[in-house]
Structures are given as structure tokens and as C-alpha cells.
Swiss-Prot record:
Located on the platform of the 30S subunit, it bridges several disparate RNA helices of the 16S rRNA. Forms part of the Shine-Dalgarno cleft in the 70S ribosome. Belongs to the universal ribosomal protein uS11 family. PROSITE patterns: RIBOSOMAL_S11. This is Small ribosomal subunit protein uS11. It comes from the Bacteria. Pfam families: Ribosomal_S11 (PF00411).
Amino acid sequence: MARKTNTRKRRVKKNIESGIAHIRSTFNNTIVTITDVHGNAISWSSAGALGFKGSRKSTPFAAQMAAEAAAKASMEHGMKTVEVNVKGPGAGREAAIRALQAAGLEITAIKDVTPVPHNGCRPPKRRRV
């Protein structure tokens, strides 16, 4: 029987000038996904994927590092300008936006797309620490 050669598909370098940076900032983590204008993912990163564990994932510094990593990966595909969609109540919202700008991406618009219920599900009980 012929042996299969273990070949991995190489990433194709796309040439995309502008896109959308989706920042999902929760109380536990920050996920940054950079897509083209149609919503196809070009690069992504998160605080957890960079090795932050536990409560360190929810820090603004972790969000900054995640945004930098995603921005660098997208700039390899020719990305220059991004619109930013921010979702969630987390600590890393502003830090991630600043990191995208510092990495060299030009930010054209910032939108808050946090879903707000029209009085839907009951929220979790308040924490008593």
C-alpha cells in the first residue's frame, strides 16, 4: 500500500486593501478577527491563543497583544485600512482599538455592535465578593 505524504495546504497570500476588524470583548477573554468586506476571515487572534490563562486573559494588555497579532497577520495579506466593530462589555475594548492603530492599520470607522435585548432573558445574578 502506498504511503500518504503528509502535506499541509499553504496559506494563499491574498491582496486585500481594506477590511473589518471584529473585536469581541467579554469579561473573560478578547477575540479579534479581521475579515474582508464580505466577512471572510483573513486573520484572528485571542488572548487565550497567545498563552494568557485564567484572569490574565481579561486584561487590557492581553487584548492589546491579541489585536497586534491579528493586525500583523492581516498586514501580511496587504491590509491597510479597517472599520472596527466592537462587541461586548469587556476591559479590552479600547486597548484593542489602540493596538490596531499602533500596529499600522488606518481605522476608518468605529461601531459598537453590542447586542442589546428588548428585555429578553433574565441576566445572571449580581456577584457578591
